[in-house]
Amino acid sequence: MDSKFFKLLLLGGAVRFYFCRTPLAPMIGNRVEFATPLNSHKRMQEGIFLLQSGIDPYLGDLVHESPLILSALSGLFQKYPQFLPIFYIILDICTAALLYAMSLRFVKQKQDQQDKERKEYAKDTEELQFGPLDKLDIPELVIVAYLFSPLTVMSCIGMTSTVISNLFLAFFFYCLVKGMLIPCLLVLAFETVRSFYPIVLIAPLLLVFSRNSVRRGVAIAALFIVSCLIVAVANYFVLNSWNFLDGTLGFIFYFRDLQPNIGLFWYFFTEMFEHFRTMFLITFQLNATVLYLVPLSIKLRKEPLLLATVLVALMAVFRAYPSLGDVGFYLALLPLWKRCWKFMAHGFVVFTFFLVTLSMMGALWHLWIYAGSANANFYFGATLAFSTGQIFLITDLLFAHVKREFCLFNGQKILIDGEEARIVLK
Amino acid sequence: MGLLSDPSISTQSKLVDGLARHVRKVCYALYVAGVAWFFCLALPEFNHGTYLSENALSPGLVYPEIRIDANRLAIQLLEELQRERKDHLSTTPHAWIAAKMNEFGLETHTHNYTLRYPFGGGKEYHGKNIYGILRAPRIASTEGIVFAAPYRAASSVHTDISASVPLLLAFADFARRKNYWAKDLIFLITEQEQLGMQAWLEAYHDGDRELDLSKAYLRPGNLPARAGSLQAALNIEVQDLEIDHVDVRIEGLNGKLPNLDMFNLVQRIMAREGIASGYKQAPRKKRRHSQSHFEQNFRQMLTMLASQSSGVPTGNHGLFHRYRIDALTIAANRRATHATLKGSPGSAAVPLLKAIEGIARSLNNLLERFHQSFFFYVIVSNDRYISIGDYMPALVALVACAFLKAYLTWSTLPATNAELEKAAGWLREHEQEAELEENLEPDKFELPYGSVLIYLTATLLIGFLCNVLPLQQYFLEIPMGAAPLTTSVLSFLSLIGFVLPFVVVLPPGGLELLHVAFLLIYGCALIVIGLLNFALGLFAAVLTVPLVIALETKEENSRSTLRNTIRLATLVMNPMMVVYVIVLAMTFYQFPELPVQKIMLRAATAAMDASAYGLIDSVIYGNWLYFVICTIFLPLWIICWTLSLSKRRDYADYLDFDESPSTSPQPQSKVKTN
Amino acid sequence: MFNIMLVKFVVIFALILASCRVEADNTSVLPEGFVDAAQRSTHTNNWAVLVDASRFWFNYRHVANVLSIYRSVKRLGIPDSQIILMIADDMACNARNPRPGQVYNNANQHINVYGDDVEVDYRGYEVTVENFVRLLTGRTQNGTARSKKLLSDAGSNVLIYLTGHGGDGFLKFQDSEEITSQELADGIQQMWEKKRYNELFFMVDTCQAASLYEKFTSPNVLAVASSLVGEDSLSHHVDPSIGVYMIDRYTYYALEFLEKVQPFSKRTIGEFLQVCPKRVCISTVGVRKDLYPRDPHKVPITDFFGAIRPTRVSTDRINVTLANEDDFIFDKDKMVTKKPFKIVMESQFPSELFK
C-alpha cells in the first residue's frame, strides 16, 4: 500500500509539473476564480520586491500577505525564481501526505470507537460502519481527491498562496487528529493572523483538547490568544511596524478590494449604497465567522473533525476573498465521511451544479470583460449558483451525518404504521 | 428547507423511478417544446419592435449639411480611381489614395504587414493599408471612430466595390471642414479583404507589444499614429455611386453582434434619407410580398442564425468586435441597369453621403461605448428583434434534456453486482439460484471511475491533437496544400476515434458511467457554446439532442433495429460527416444542374477546403469554430459512438476480473492512441 | 337602525355646513388695512439659486434653461454675488458645439443665453445633492468661498430654479444621485427655521415637476412646476445644425415673458404663473399657492426676479445718532467687574540658565 501512496504522490506531482509548463499556468495565475487579491502570485512577488527594497509593502494597496511568509520566501523568490513552481508543487504534495496521514489516523480512531460501541448498534447497519477495508480506501480517496482535483491542481500551477494556506490547514487537521496541542495551536494562530477566518477552527480545537473540562478549555483559549500575540509580534519584528495588521486583517475585514471573485461579497459591496456599508460589512463577516459556529459546535460536539470540515467549507463559501483552491481543499476532506454518503441525496446535483457553473464562469467572464456584451450580473449569477451548490453540499453532509447517527442505533428500516418513517429536524 | 433536508431515510425516490421509466418520453417532450418555442419566436407576439435606448445618439436631429458638391467630388474621384485601376491591376493605388488624403488635410499614414502562410512549405505575403486621421479640433485624442473601406484590386474575383474609396474620401473632405468632432475620425482603406483589417486592428491594439514573431502567422507590425480608444466603426462597401439598396451586415467573428442600438441607428438614418436598407435586404425587384409575416420572419431568423453559426464575419466590421468595438458594414448594392432612372447622375450618391454624415454625427455624440441596448438578439425583420431572454428558453429546454437524462441515468445506475448483471442482460436462467444466494449478501459494487476517466481523457486528447497536429512543423514542411493536410490529419484522428471502442472495452458499469459523463459534458458544452455563439449552440442542439435522447446503453429494453438505427445515426453525426453533408447541401443548392457524382466530388473538395479554412481562420483571426468542432464535438462523438456500440466485456471475463484481489478502481483499459 | 344612521349623517352634514359658513364669515370680517398690509412687499434683498442638475451633451436644453433664467434675473438687477449658479456641464465649450462659446435658446439664434459674463458658482461634479442641500440650509463646509454661499436672511426673497431629469418625487442629479421631494421640503423648512428667507419662489422645469413641491410645509412659499405628476415636460424644438434639443417649452415661454419685463415694470407674478398655457406647453403647469399668503396678482414679478426694494423717499429731517454703550447695557449694577490682575512678562529666551 505504501508504494501506491508514493506512486500517487509522484503522479500528482507529475500532473502539476506538466501543467506548470503549459501556457495554462500564467493564465490560471490571472484568473479571478483562483487568484484573489489575497493569494495572487503577482502580489506576493510585489511584496517581496518591496520588502527587499526596504519599503513597507503595506503602505500601498497591493500586498496582503503576512510579513513572515514574505520574508521566509524572499530568498527563494529573488535567487531561484525558476524553482518556484517546483516549490509550490512540493508544498502541495506535503499537504496531500499530511491529509493521508491524518485520514489514516482518523479511520483508526473511528474503528476503535466503533469497537467499543458495537453492541449498541442496530442490526443491518454494516454498510454504515467503518469496514476493515476503509483503513486503506478512505485515505486513498482523500489523497486522490486532493491530488487530482482540478481545483487544487490549477490553484497550485497558478502559484497562489492558497497552496500555503492549505498546507497549514492540513497540518492543523493532522495535529488535531494526532492530539498534538501545541503545534496545532501555533499553526492555527499563524493562519488566523494571516487570513483571519481560520479563527473559527478554535471550536473543534477546544472540543478535542479540553476533554469536557471548562478550565482546560479556558486555558487553551488563553494559550491561543497568547500564541496569536506571539505570531503578531514575530510579524512585527520583520518590519518593525504594525502596518501589516491593517494590510492583512484590516484588508480582509473591511473588504477594500472589490475585484470580482467566486464569493458573495464583491457584488453586494459594489451595488450597495455607501452608507449601509458598515452594517453589511459586519453582517457578512458575522455570517462568515460566528453565525454558524455556536449551533454547529453544540450539534457536532462529538465529531470535532466533522465540525472542522464543515467550518472550513463554510469559510470557503462565505469568506471575503474565496478562491477555488479553498473549495478544492474541503472537497478533499469529504471522503472522510464516506460512510455518510449513502444519505447524501444531492451529490450528483451538486456535482452537476459545480460543472455547469464553473464552465459558465469562464464563458461569462469572457463575455463580460473581453467581448463587452454581457455584464457583471451574468457573472455574479454564475458565482451565486456556485455558492448555492456548495451550501447544498454542506447541508447535505450535515444532514447525512445526522441520519447516519440515527440509523446506526435504530436500524435502517423503521416502519411506523406500515409507512416508512421520516426524520424531522427539531 | 425541504429541498435541503429531505426527511426520508431511504435514498430511493418514487418520483425518480417513475421519471426514469419514461425518460425518453419526457425528454422528447422537452425537445419538442424547445423547438416549438423557437418556431414561435417568429410570431409577432414573441418579438418586440426595435427602439433606440442610448439617449446620447440623438439620431436624425441634425439636418445633413453635405451637399451636391461632395457628390461631385466623389464622381470626380471615382473617375480618377478608375484610371488608376488600369495601371494597378492587382495592387492598390496606394500613392493616389495617400495623395488624396494628404490633399484633403488628413494626417496620412501607411501600415505594412506580413502574413506568413504556414502550409505547403510556407510563403510570405505583404500588404499595405492606408489610413488618415482627422483629429478632433477642440478635444484631446482620447477616442476615435473608424470609417473603413476595403479596396479590391481590379483582378479580384469578388464584386467590384471600388466606389467605396471615393465615397469615403468625399466624406473625409466634408468632415475636415467641420469643427464639431469630439472624437478623432480615422479613414481607413484596407486591402486583401479581412486580412488587412485584422492586421491593422492588431497593429492598432498590440502593435507596440513585443510578440514572439516565430510563432505568429500574421505579423501586424506597428502603426505610426493612433487616435485613442476606438468607440465604433463603420465599414463601407459600395458597388457604385448609383445604388439600389443598402444591406446592413452585422454578424461578426464568432457570431458576435454589434449593439442593437448601432443597427437601429443605421436603420433610422437610412430611412430618413429614403434609402431602402435593412438586414439581408433584397433588391427591389426580388422582394417577396406573397409570404406571410410568419414565414418572412422565420426565414430571416434562420438566415441570420445560419450566418452567425459559422462564426465567420460577413464583412470587415466583424473583426472589430473582437476588440470590443461595435461595428457594422453598410453594403450598398448597384442599381440594376435601367435608363429611365438615370436622370440625375449628378446627385446619385447624395443620400448615401447624407446617411454617412448622420451616422458619423450620432456616433460623435456618444459619451461612452454602446452599452444601453442588447448585444444578444436575433433580428426577425428590419424593425423587430428577439432578445436573449426570449430565445434562450428554446436552447435551455433542449439542454435540459441532457441534464435530466443524466440525472435519471445516474440515479438508476447499478449499485450491486446483481443489478449490473440484470442491466447487462447477462442473467441466465441457470444462474438464477446463484444470484438469489448472492442477493442475501449484496456485495457493494464500485463503479469504474478510473477507467472511465482515462477513456474520457483519451478522447479529449484526440480532440486536442486535431488542433495541434496540423500545425506541427513536421507536417507543415510537407509540400502539400492546407486542405489535404488538414483533412488527412482529421480523418486519421477520426479513424482512431472510430476504432477506439473496438479496441478498448470498458469494465462493467463503465458504459453507464460513461453515459452519465457524456450527458454532463454534452450539456455543459451546449450551454457554453450557446452563451458564446447562440446560433451554433442551437443548431448543434437541434441536430444532436434527438440522437442523445435515443441513445441507451441498456440492452434489455431496446430492439436491435432501433439500436442499428442509432448506430447509423451516430455515424452520420460524425463532425466531418456533418460538415460534408452541409457542404453537399449547399453545393446541390448552388449547382442543381450538375450530375450527382460530380456534385458529391465537388462537395468533397469544398469540405476539405472548408476544414482548412476553419483551421486558418482559427489561427489568424481567432475563429472558434474549428476549435469547438475538434475539441468538443469530436470527443463527444467518439463517446457517443462508444455508447451506441455498447461493447461489453464477456461476462466470464468479468467474473475472472472480479475474483482478483484488487477492489480499487484500477484503470483496466490500455488506451492506444497514436 | 338604518334610520338612526341616516339621521346622524344628516346632523353631521348640517354641522359641517354651519361651521363652513362661520369660517367664511370670519374671513370677510378681516380689516381692510390688514389685508392690504399682507399684500405689501416686505423683503429687503433678493437671492437666486439656479440649478441645472444634468450633464451630457444631449441635455443641452437644461443648460439653456438655467442660463435663460440666469440671464433674466441678472438683467433685472440681482447682482452676480447674489446668484448661485449650479451647472453640471459645460455646453458652451463642449467639443460637439459647432458654435463654441455660445448657448442659444432658439434655433434662429435670437438670444445667446451664455452671454458675455456668466459666473458659474458650482460646476461639473460640484453639482451634487449634498452641495445643493448644504447651500440651501447654510451648512456649507468650512472654507467654502463666499460666492458659493447663500447668505440670505429673514428679509430675503429667494428664487430657486431647478431643471434636469425628474420623476415622481425626485430630481436626478448627474445620473448618479437624486434629491427627493421630501429632502427638498426638509431643506426649505430648515431655511425657514433659520430665518434664511422672507418669501420663496420655487420654480422647477422637469418631468413630473409638480411632485417636487408636494411635500412643502413651510410658509411663504410659492411654487410653480412645468408639469403635473404623471406628465412629461417637453422640449421646445431642435436646432438641426447642432443636433440637440435647444430648450424646454416651459422655460422657453418663461424667458419670452421675462424678456419683456423691465426693472420697473408692473408685471406681476400672477401673470408669470400663466405664462405657458397647455396649448403651447403640452404639459400642464402646476402652481401651489396655499402656503403663500399674498395674492400673486398683486405681487410684482421683480419681487423675485429683480432686486427692486420698497424704498420711500422722505424729505423729512431724520436724526441719526450713533449707538452708545449705555443703550445696550440696561442693568449696570449687575455687571461683574473683572478683578485687576498682574501681568508678568516671560522672557523669550531662558538666558538666566547660561549665566
From Swiss-Prot, chain C:
Signal peptide: 1-24
Cross-referenced Pfam families: Peptidase_C13
Coiled coil: none
Keyword Protein transport: no
Keywords of this entry: GPI-anchor biosynthesis, Hydrolase, Protease, Signal, Thiol protease
GO biological process, one term: attachment of GPI anchor to protein
GO MF term (any one): GPI-anchor transamidase activity
Pathway involvement of the protein, from the record: Glycolipid biosynthesis; glycosylphosphatidylinositol-anchor biosynthesis
Gene3D superfamilies: 3.40.50.1460
UniProt GO cellular component terms: endoplasmic reticulum; GPI-anchor transamidase complex
E.C. number: 3.-.-.-
Domain of life: Eukaryota
Uppermost EC category: hydrolase
Disulfide bonds: none
Active site: 165, 207
Membership in a protein family: Belongs to the peptidase C13 family.
Described function: Mediates GPI anchoring in the endoplasmic reticulum, by replacing a protein's C-terminal GPI attachment signal peptide with a pre-assembled GPI. During this transamidation reaction, the GPI transamidase forms a carbonyl intermediate with the substrate protein.
Name this protein carries in UniProt: Putative GPI-anchor transamidase
Organism: Drosophila melanogaster
Name of the coding gene: PIG-K
